[in-house]
Design a protein with these regions (language model features):
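Short, Lys/Arg-rich, polar N-terminal cytosolic tail immediately upstream
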Residues: 1-13
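Membrane-helix boundary elements
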Residues: 11-47
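Membrane-water interface at the C-terminal end of transmembrane alpha helices
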Residues: 14, 113-135
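Alpha-helical membrane-inserting segments
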Residues: 26-37, 60-68, 88-92, 96, ...
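Structural signature of hydrophobic alpha-helical transmembrane segments
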Residues: 44-56
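Small-residue-rich segments of transmembrane alpha-helices in multi-pass membrane proteins
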Residues: 53, 80-92, 111
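Internal alpha-helical transmembrane segments of multi-pass membrane proteins
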Residues: 66-84, 102-109
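Membrane-helix boundary connector in multi-pass membrane proteins
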Residues: 91-107
């Protein structure tokens, strides 16, 4: 009995959409947590002003890595997406006159790293477990 390595296929449209939405929602959660921790409260305008630079950074990361091909992978595209989100986001904050303190950059790196890489790690673990169960199930039927 020979065991073959599963062929890597580009992601399905549903997976791409869910991954993009997950990334955007997690960046928004980062923004809302940050604003509330500074007693800025929720205002749509203020939240959008804080959110847009990171959203643009996220989009740049997706485009630069062609993340739609394998959006759930951690190393590529996950790590570059995370770094583009932070670096481009901070650069755009500077250009738009928003504050960029060193402590904020550190917090953004940590929190967005946990958020943008964390869900990918979890999804990858779940997918591996599902693949193993499916392989075991098909092997037992054969």
């Amino acid at each position: 009995m020979t065991q073959t390595t599963p062929v890597r296929r580009p992601a399905a449209t549903r997976t791409i959409v869910l991954a993009a939405v997950a990334d955007l929602v997690l960046v928004l959660v980062f923004v809302l947590i940050g604003r509330s921790s500074h007693s800025e409260g929720f205002s749509l305008g203020g939240s959008l002003v804080t959110f847009w630079p990171f959203a643009v950074g996220l989009v740049v990361g997706w485009l630069a890595t062609r993340a739609w091909r394998y959006p759930v992978r951690v190393v590529l595209p996950g790590i570059p997406i995370w770094l583009f989100t932070v670096v481009v986001g901070m650069f755009l904050r500077v250009l738009s006159g928003q504050g960029v303190e060193v402590s904020f950059v550190i917090v953004a790196l940590i929190v967005l790293g946990v958020f943008l890489l964390g869900w990918r790690l979890i999804a990858g673990a779940v997918a591996k477990r599902t693949d193993k169960r499916a392989a075991k199930s098909s092997a037992s039927r054969a």
